[in-house]
Amino acid sequence: MKKNRFTYGLALGALGVVFGDIGTSPLYALKVTLSGIPINQFNILGVLSLIFWSLIIVVSFKYLMIIFRADNNGEGGILALLALMKHKSTKYQPLFYIVAIFGAGLLLGDGMLTPAISVVSAVEGLGTLSDKLYPYVLPIASLILILLFSLQATGTGRIGYLFGPLILVWFITIAILGILQIAEHPVVLKAINPYYAIAFLVDEGLQGYLLLGGIFLVVTGGEALFADIGHFGKNPIRFSWFFAALPCLLLNYFGQGANLIVRPEAISNPFFMIAPSWFYLPLIIIATVATVIASQAVITATFSLTKQAVLLGLCPKIPIVQTSMLHSGQIYVPQINFILFIGTMAFCLAFKTSDNLAHAYGIAVNLEMLLVDAMVAYAAISIWRWSIFNVMFLFGLFLLIDLAFLGANTHKFITGGWVPIVLAFFIAFIMYSWRYGLEYLRDNFYMNKEDISKILKQLQYKSLNQLPGVSAIFITDVYDKSGGSFLHFLKLSRSVPENVLIVNYIVDNIPYVHYSQRYEIVCLDEKVCKLVIHYGFMETINIPRSLEKACNKNILPFKFNVDTATFMVEIPNIMASKEKRSLSFYWQEKLFAFLMRNYSANLNIEFYKLPYNRTIAIGTYCIL
């Protein structure tokens, strides 16, 4: 009984986070799809049939039944998939990196468009009250978005528990509105028959095919189901989809279609015009709340994706702020929030209406779905051990469908869809350059590493100036496992603290690391030890807290107080070589050197959660 209550609770929570994006698509999807073609029963049934089978095949079958199998120890998303691939393949790792970082860039671009189109489409409902209110749509939507991004720093912990019930109210509302229309014109239920979808595509030809770009809007947000596995689990998400989101969405789409059959003029805003006039204002309020929640879910997912990228070494250690002491998943990334805000506002001000935004929306998500399909297909062969025939048949079907959508979406590239794609390339270049630079640094430190034991003997450890009562913790970065900061300190000061701990952290290719696998320790001397701390890519790196737990568990051979110990971090000064090898490498080196110089000691201190008043930065120099 308790297990069922827990599942229902997670399912309700999933409604508010996972289905906000796909759940608000009825605001604009049918309007965009049917605009430009005759509003008659044949066309309406054809479009509704395409919507029905798109939701069944792409979301219900592909994502919930197949893609869900490719989780990484309970975590989903394209970067979690990358970490899983690193376990299983070395041959194709460079390709996986390129695919994953480009996919991550596409999701960031989507994070700008989704809040814009969702909020604007909801506020456009004011036009149903009076034409005089249309000029106020953009200012009101902009104000809502400004408030939304401004409040990110405070976190959503206090109101987050309301998201599920509020989205449930949204789904119930749109379902009832749809049922009322279907009851009057049940002929729309014929659209469940795939014949109408096929007949529509055959009859309309090229124009019908291009309308698939509008149909694709009903499945945007489906990628969020896979990305949010770790937050809620597979079964609660499936339960929420099949018993709440899917039936409510279909009822509303079919209700809009039923209304359009008898009132073709309702195409100006088919979502709001299925409601009675007295319900317009309450519906606008409910829709606006739902779109804000959907936007919040996208923003939070982008923050989570950024955290994964930082921990996997795909981007610099930008500041990540924990907004909740109880829930590690509630984070705020100031720089990403600012980028999303600027991008979202730029889209709103440039495109002005939901129709215009829809002509730029979808192509980035479409490409990301294709990349996930390809990676999961490889996982099916290498991890699940499916036969080549089964993989080619099933994923060939998925790729065929996604490529068909992509072909229909290509015209969106010139109407604004190029923006998230160009942004994705830019982000991918930054990530690839960062990864390339870290690998170079790792190789450089490895080739020039020094044996600490030999150095201690050469410096006559016993004759060095002793610092009694002083405990020093030297933190080395992922590219330097030899303890370079400690060696620099010894050579410069010719003094040694009473207790020395050289700490290196490793982010494993799993979301969470069990306590029994958290620590590795090697002692070089009775007072000098090297400690490796393992983290998962979904965890928060907190060196002082991890050391405190290690002390409490008597893992270290000596006692020291973390609250009084001195921390030392290594800050490399990277310079790009003046030797020109190739233009791409040259610019990668320049970019990496710039990023390293600008992620200063302060960012390292924040990233490791070190106390500012007890941390010393030790500089090093390296030429790429």
Curated annotation (Swiss-Prot):
Keyword Membrane listed: yes
Coarse class of the protein's main subcellular location: membrane
Coiled coil residues, start to end: none
Gene Ontology molecular function: any one: potassium ion transmembrane transporter activity
GO annotations of cellular component type: plasma membrane
Keyword Membrane: yes
InterPro entries xrefs: K+_transporter, K_trans_C, K_trans_N, Kup
Subcellular location: Cell inner membrane
Role: Transport of potassium into the cell. Likely operates as a K(+):H(+) symporter.
Record-stated family: Belongs to the HAK/KUP transporter (TC 2.A.72) family.
Protein name: Probable potassium transport system protein Kup 1
